[in-house]
Amino acid sequence: MKPDSEKLTHVDEDGKAQMVDVGCKEDTNRSATASGKVFMGVETIEALKKQELKKGDVLGVARVAGIQAAKKTSDLIPLCHPLVINFVSVDFKIKERHVEIEATVKTFGKTGVEMEALTACSATALTIYDMCKAVDKSITIEEVKLVEKTGGKSGNWYRS
């Protein structure tokens, strides 16, 4: 048998999926940041910067999509707990060939917000894709990943 820290918490002793019982855990401040990149052609980046795409303000709509997605994570990911989310931000850096996305989520609760940050980042990237796909079929979404998480029993973690 593996030590407790190595056991999968979302399966019971028979290997069936279960939602983890967090009822006895202490509430703590928790945060998570995820990042991702949406690669596209230079012409598409320029049109995005100048807000010349027919679907409108791509980054504004994508930001709202990311915030909404963070709030809906437990509806999308079956074993995620519904959480009271205290803060969500979605920020962008526009580079020559891609848009960098950074999504941060915060709560005061019994479980972390890593999935909420990853879901926010993913939905943001998908929205950018959706709003730009008519002019650029080569768009790719890459490197969606957790960058850092703070709080909780396992403490802080930072990607190096």
Regions found by a protein language model. Give the residues of each.
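C-terminal binding/interaction regions
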Residues: 2-59, 64-79, 86-160
